[in-house]
Structure formats: structure tokens, C-alpha cells
Amino acid sequence: MASSKAAINLQDIFLNQVRKEHVPVTVYLINGFQLKGTVKGFDNFTVVLESESKQQLLIYKHAISTISPQKPVIFSGSEKDDKKEE
């Protein structure tokens, strides 16, 4: 039954929170580059980042190592789902 239920996607929850709250992030790529800005959108394969100079960057997720927010992200939706599974 767990397979038919929508699985919690922590990645989507995280990206959506930083997008909605306009939290500045640092994106570390696997080649060592660092990109700073705010998340404007994302899908299954890409993240759109708006840099501090207002340039929009389309980043492929397979090139991302880490995304570090400048402030803690509250995972409000995941707590409700955790309680439902108990």
C-alpha cells in the first residue's frame, strides 16, 4: 500500500520551502564551483537559480553536490506525514 501512496519527497519539500521563503542558498557543484542566489523553480531534473546579480541559471541536478541555505529550513509538511504513518 505504501507504493500507491505519494511518497514524501524531501528534496521537493526543501526546494519548495527555500523558493517560497526566498531563502538565499549556496549551490555547490560536483566540479567545485559555488553558485549563490535564490531558487526560482525546479523540476525532476533541473533547478533555476537567480544569482545575486539577477542572472537566471538553469542547473542540472546531476551536477549538484550540495545546496546550503543561509537559514534553517522548516519541514512543516513532513511532520504531518510522519504522524500519519505511525
Curated annotation (Swiss-Prot):
GO MF annotation: an example: RNA binding
A cellular component term, taken from the record's GO annotations: cytosol
Keywords in alphabetical order: RNA-binding, Stress response
The Sm domain, residue ranges: 12-73
Transmembrane segments: none
UniProt entry tagged with the keyword RNA-binding: yes
HAMAP family reported in the protein's UniProt record: Hfq
PANTHER family recorded: RNA-BINDING PROTEIN HFQ (PTHR34772:SF1)
Protein name per the record: RNA-binding protein Hfq
Natural source organism: Caldanaerobacter subterraneus subsp. tengcongensis (strain DSM 15242 / JCM 11007 / NBRC 100824 / MB4)
Gene (name only): hfq
